Amino acid sequence: KNSRALTAGGGGGEYNVARGLRRCFGLRTAVITALADNEVGRLIEDFILQGGVDTSFIKWMSYDGIGRNVRNGLNFTERGYGIRGAVGVSDRGNTAASQLRAKDVDWDYIFGKLGVRWLHTGGIFAALSETSAQTVIAAVKKAKEYGTVVSYDLNYRPSLWKGIGGQEKAQ
């Protein structure tokens, strides 16, 4: 509520891991997500590409010009000052990522043909919608079928789970 200037930057739990593995260790990484096909979506794609992360698994969703059907998720973070911590506000309703379904991704191709060795996902993506958790479970099950290592960031944000069942649903 106090900020008057914004700086755009890319980030997110799963992406941060992929970018870190690419930049710090030179590993090939990719993100599996969905973005609205508009200028903000292309900006997000550019941030991901600048991090050296493969974007070929992004599902581009048609944008209607106003966001009635699909949007790109945003998170506003006001820096802390002194003893006051940072304050974050998520704006993630009706996003492309929240609409991504397990059937939208060819998991057999990714874990089988490509032989992806590691899947990293987490609680923030799982909380985006009723079906996001189902998508996570489907991805994890398919990864396990192929012997792919799975890591899961337990990051629990009460504000994201509040409207879909709270902590009980998150567990």
Model regions: which residues?
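Active-site flanking residues adjacent to catalytic metal/cofactor-binding acidic residues
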Residues: 1, 33, 152-154
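Alpha-helix C-terminal capping segments
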Residues: 9, 16-28, 50
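Conserved alpha-helical elements of sugar-nucleotide-dependent glycosyltransferases
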Residues: 13, 40, 135
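Conserved beta-alpha-beta core of the PfkB/ribokinase-like small-molecule kinase fold
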Residues: 118-171
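Conserved N-terminal subdomain of the carbohydrate kinase-like
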Residues: 28-123
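Short amphipathic alpha-helical segment that frequently serves as the phosphate-/nucleotide-binding helix
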Residues: 3-4, 45, 133-137
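Short pre-catalytic strand/loop immediately N-terminal to key active-site residues, enriched for Gly-Thr
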Residues: 2-11
